[in-house]
């Protein structure tokens, strides 16, 4: 399910000629492409442990499904600027600091596990959709937690700075569930909180939960449960008011998805053994979510 653009089809047709000209034009002054051209370097934000989207492998190389999108965008920038030897600098970011670091110019864009929603669009711009997730629960298999209603009076962990944290706090307040919500610094810390017994469930995007389960010492001891509290679209994040760079990113994403490359990336990262431990996530997409790859 590709994220729909707000413009109507008629408006899109009316703008198409102008956009084509913008794509061929030199980088606009003050734009991201202008900054990259002047500095001779593109700075890419990445996650450290968002398996299998953006994370370090056992060689400390940044890899993942979303990182493949980042790499494709970098290649498109090199081609656009005619700079095949453009320096590429990678900067680790977190759920908490990704938006401030983007806004202050520390990095130019990121493709990771960032949800594109109305609230974040006030602070940053987003590419078209690269993945669709549902927010669910990871819990011990065979336990009492089967859905969100079972969390009443229980300790639940969630990663700080995420949309899941907002949703969980809202659910707790509106349903008067008296949950003790633990906000962990990253997904790995969230799972360790669950694994240690300090929480009965870990709420997060289902694909990220599958990644944490795959990394566990005994993956079969854990299961993903619960009706999704939201369906969320991941997009690559860039600074606001930069239509030229956004178009380059969207065009690159469209090419990857229509060529079938995105399908290959999904199979590579979600249905086959992946580094660093050669674990297989065995993650399947619903028909609706599968449309985000096409």
Regions found by a protein language model. Name each.
Residues 23-27, 71-76, 149, 154-155, ...:
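Extended ligand-binding regions for polar small-molecule ligands
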Residues 23-27, 163-182, 220-222, 253-294:
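Ligand-binding clefts/hinges and TM-proximal coupling segments of bilobed small-molecule sensing domains
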Residues 71, 75, 83-150, 290-292:
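Acidic, polar ligand-binding/catalytic clefts
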Residues 46-50, 91-96, 105-117, 141, ...:
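Beta->alpha turn/N-cap motifs
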Residues 48, 131-139, 206, 214-253, ...:
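Periplasmic-binding protein-like
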Residues 43, 49-52, 62-79, 115, ...:
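Bilobed "Venus flytrap"/periplasmic-binding protein-like clamshell domains
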Residues 97, 111-122, 167-174, 195-230:
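A ligand-binding cleft/hinge motif common to bilobed small-molecule-binding domains
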Residues 24-109:
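Extracytoplasmic small-molecule ligand-binding "clamshell" domains
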């Amino acid at each position: 399910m590709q994220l729909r653009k707000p413009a109507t089809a008629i408006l899109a047709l009316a703008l198409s000629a102008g956009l084509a000209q913008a794509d061929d034009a030199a980088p606009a002054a003050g734009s991201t492409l202008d900054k990259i051209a002047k500095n001779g370097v593109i700075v890419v934000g990445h996650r450290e442990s968002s398996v299998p989207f953006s994370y370090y492998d056992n060689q400390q190389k940044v890899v993942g499904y979303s990182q493949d999108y980042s790499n494709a965008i970098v290649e498109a920038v090199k081609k656009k600027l005619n700079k095949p030897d453009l320096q590429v600098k990678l900067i680790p970011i977190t759920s908490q600091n990704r938006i401030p670091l983007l806004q202050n110019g520390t990095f130019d864009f990121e493709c990771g596990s960032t949800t594109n929603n109305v609230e974040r669009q006030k602070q940053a711009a987003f590419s078209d959709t690269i993945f669709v997730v549902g927010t669910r629960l990871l819990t011990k298999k065979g336990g009492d937690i089967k859905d969100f209603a079972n969390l009443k009076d229980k300790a639940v962990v969630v990663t700080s700075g995420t949309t899941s944290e907002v949703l969980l706090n809202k659910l707790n307040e509106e349903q008067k569930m008296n949950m003790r919500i633990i906000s962990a610094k990253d997904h790995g810390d969230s799972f360790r909180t669950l694994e240690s017994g300090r929480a009965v469930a870990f709420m997060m995007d289902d694909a990220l939960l599958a990644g944490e389960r795959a990394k566990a010492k005994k993956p079969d001891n854990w299961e993903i449960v619960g009706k999704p509290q939201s369906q969320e679209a991941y997009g690559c994040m860039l600074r606001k008011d930069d239509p030229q760079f956004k178009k380059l990113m969207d065009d690159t994403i469209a090419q990857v998805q229509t060529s079938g490359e995105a399908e290959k990336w999904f199979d590579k990262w979600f249905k086959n053994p992946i580094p660093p431990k050669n674990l297989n996530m065995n993650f399947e997409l619903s028909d609706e979510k599968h449309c985000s790859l096409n």
